[in-house]
Amino acid sequence: MKTFEDLFAELSAKAARRPEGSKTVAELDAGVHGIGKKVVEEAAEVWMACEYESDAEAAEEISQLLYHVQVMMIAKGMSLEDVYTHL
């Protein structure tokens, strides 16, 4: 099972290596505006899944939102600690 920290490390490594065909790299190349659209889309899907779908489907949507939020963090040059200081 992957943790929030594991995912961030994996995505950071992909951002540094920039493997060809990586969806993470493509999203980073879309910039903050493009990533922001994905964050908003996924947030809406989380809401709808929590309202109308199973807990498993809601958890999957939440995991996708967390992925896109972490991509945004990387695009902005933020670390986990930058966010943790506000929790």
UniProtKB/Swiss-Prot annotation:
Highest taxon of the lineage: Bacteria
GO CC annotation, single: cytoplasm
CDD domains hit by this protein: NTP-PPase_HisE
InterPro entries: HisE, PRib-ATP_PPHydrolase-like
Pfam families associated with the record: PRA-PH
UniProt catalytic activity: 1-(5-phospho-beta-D-ribosyl)-ATP + H2O = 1-(5-phospho-beta-D-ribosyl)-5'-AMP + diphosphate + H(+)
Entry keyword set: Amino-acid biosynthesis, ATP-binding, Cytoplasm, Histidine biosynthesis, Hydrolase, Nucleotide-binding
Family per record: Belongs to the PRA-PH family.
Name recorded for this polypeptide: Phosphoribosyl-ATP pyrophosphatase
Organism for this UniProt entry: Kocuria rhizophila (strain ATCC 9341 / DSM 348 / NBRC 103217 / DC2201)
Gene: hisE
